[in-house]
């Protein structure tokens, strides 16, 4: 079972490279779209 992201270091990871962080600016949205194009299973953390 996964731990979620309540641990200290994981909060930093999620804030920097999580889905909502990527959606917050245009370059992040470009990253998500390129990962969707490659059909990645995970598009964000």
Curated annotation (Swiss-Prot):
Family: Belongs to the bacterial ribosomal protein bL34 family.
UniProt-annotated location(s): Plastid, Chloroplast
Positions with biased composition (Basic residues): 32-45
Coiled coil: none
Region of interest (Disordered), residue spans: 1-45
Lineage: Eukaryota, Rhodophyta, Florideophyceae, Rhodymeniophycidae, Gracilariales
Membrane spanning residue stretches: none
Protein name in UniProt: Large ribosomal subunit protein bL34c
GO BP terms: translation
Keyword RNA-binding: no
An MF annotation (GO) of this entry: structural constituent of ribosome
Top-level taxon of origin: Eukaryota
Main location (coarse class): plastid
Keyword Ribonucleoprotein annotated: yes
InterPro entries reported for this sequence: Ribosomal_bL34
Keywords, comma-separated and alphabetical: Chloroplast, Plastid, Ribonucleoprotein, Ribosomal protein
Gene: rpl34
Regions of compositional bias (Polar residues) in chain numbering: 1-10
Pfam families hit by this protein: Ribosomal_L34
Any GO CC annotation of this UniProt entry: ribosome
